[in-house]
Amino acid sequence: MNVVQGNIEAKNAKVAIVVSRFNSFLVESLLDGAIDTLKRFGQVADENITVVRVPGAVELPLAARRVAASGKFDGIIALGAVIRGGTPHFDFVAGECNKGLAQVALEFDLPVSFGVLTTDTIEQAIERSGTKAGNKGGEAALGLLEMVNVLQQLEQQLS
């Protein structure tokens, strides 16, 4: 039996982190968690990490697409925070962001890790950005590191 699974060390990986500025008091914690995870667990060097800042979650897919089209990166982490309000705006923003990022991954055959919080309350978002529910930015980085390795292994085995 042949099993393909990735580990999290990816010393030579070039990673772009596309970050929404909206709700920055939360998103900066996600960014810190992602960078810390890339460096500590993935052994990714500073010079191999590029941070791209965009206004909000809706802009994440376009920036991720441009990064992917450059061909210079092994993976992308998208970070943001969309918190439900009293209007349907949340559903549109969260849905389009998710759909757009998935499309980038499939179009460019590149791992795009979804680290965008989509919560009902600000308290839930705070819990997921580094307090009692962990740091979803760090979790997104772990997922990305593993997928970078899985895709590299698949490329070797299938070529």
Swiss-Prot record:
EC number per UniProt: 2.5.1.78
GO biological process: riboflavin biosynthetic process
Broad enzyme group: transferase
Naturally occurring in which organism (per UniProt): Shewanella denitrificans (strain OS217 / ATCC BAA-1090 / DSM 15013)
Quaternary state and interactors: Forms an icosahedral capsid composed of 60 subunits, arranged as a dodecamer of pentamers.
Known function: Catalyzes the formation of 6,7-dimethyl-8-ribityllumazine by condensation of 5-amino-6-(D-ribitylamino)uracil with 3,4-dihydroxy-2-butanone 4-phosphate. This is the penultimate step in the biosynthesis of riboflavin.
MF terms in GO: 6,7-dimethyl-8-ribityllumazine synthase activity
Family: Belongs to the DMRL synthase family.
NCBIfam families for this protein: lumazine-synth (TIGR00114), PRK00061.1-4 (NF000812)
Protein name: 6,7-dimethyl-8-ribityllumazine synthase
Active site positions: H89 (proton donor)
GO cellular component: cytosol; riboflavin synthase complex
Keywords: Riboflavin biosynthesis, Transferase
Protein origin, superkingdom: Bacteria
Catalytic activity entry: (2S)-2-hydroxy-3-oxobutyl phosphate + 5-amino-6-(D-ribitylamino)uracil = 6,7-dimethyl-8-(1-D-ribityl)lumazine + phosphate + 2 H2O + H(+)
UniProt-annotated binding residues for (2S)-2-hydroxy-3-oxobutyl phosphate: G86, T87, R128
Record-annotated membrane-spanning stretches: none
